[in-house]
Amino acid sequence: MLDHITPFFALVAFFLVLMPFAWHIKSKNVGLIMLSIWLMLGNLDNFVNSMVWWKTTADLAPAYCELSVRLRHLLFIAIPASNLAIARKLESIASTRQVRAGPGDHRRAVIIDLLICLGIPIIYTSLMIVNQSNRYGILEEAGCWPMMVFSWLWVLLVAAPVIVVSLCSAVYSALAFRWFWVRRRQFQAVLASSASTINRSHYVRLLLLTAIDMLLFFPIYVGTIAAQIKSSISIPYGSWSSVHTGFNQIPQYPASLVLMENTFQRNLILARLVCPLSAYIFFAMFGLGLEVRQGYKEAFHRALLFCRLRKEPKASALQHVVADIEVVTFRSHDTFDANTSTKSEKSDIDMRGSEAA
């Protein structure tokens, strides 16, 4: 019906984002960590939905669908919000404001990043019920899908927040690029003075990531909902009861019905491809660095040791000799006698005195 390769792309994308996740945690970049989490959850949900509802529209997992539709709705703004946090971090470093920041300022910056990456998506998802006409719908091969009523309130609570967050991210990205370009010759010194774990190469990759979000994914999102915004802005909301009539009914849409709606089919495919495509770009930028590759080697080595496919390397003879020398040296210091040393020095002085006489 739609496509048979998206679920497999999503599964591969999940593992590609998972592989360097430990390294991202060490970097302590809240925006990058949260973006990794959202991409992993989005791709895993995409794969599970496609597999469970591959050839059916039956309501097989109501509890899972309740969570899935909220996750899908949350991802509309969670990914742009994470990019906004990354762009703010880059602008703060390049503008040298982070140089003048104290420990309290760093703690405050982490809290603000968490509010952006986690708080905004939670509030955005909690308001989903206002425009939600049914608990969820089921699309063959796509799985659980949010069901919304389009009106001016949908534009205000669903479409507008994503556009505002994306525009803020674009502004910070532009400012970060401006500062980077102005201070490009001494930028390594700027990074060193900011006490940041980001090096120049990593900074450029983060800047490219925010630029791709601004130049690629934001236009795709606006392009897919522009017509809907134009048609919905003048539609009245009605009332709560009219919007939620038959809320517990679960609409089911077979593949043949979806294929009849060309616009909906196109938007559906784009919506399903955003997470896998974002994950592949993310991995290409942050999953192939030297430090990350070294982490892969260490993890692979530990896995071989755990499965007993490789033996623990034995210490060389040279290491044992060095260790023995260190032990002997340490013991010789322990047996040092201050009294003996003093007496010997005194006898030497007496002998010299007698010779002089």
Curated annotation (Swiss-Prot):
The keyword Transferase does not apply. It comes from the Eukaryota. Keywords: G-protein coupled receptor, Membrane, Pheromone response, Receptor, Transducer, Transmembrane, Transmembrane helix. GO terms for molecular function: mating-type a-factor pheromone receptor activity; mating-type factor pheromone receptor activity. Residues 338-357 are annotated as: Disordered. It is a multi-pass membrane protein. GO terms for cellular component: plasma membrane. The chain crosses the membrane at residues 5-25, 32-52, 67-90, 110-130, 145-165, 206-226, 268-288. Belongs to the G-protein coupled receptor 4 family. This is Pheromone receptor 1. It comes from Mycosarcoma maydis (Corn smut fungus).
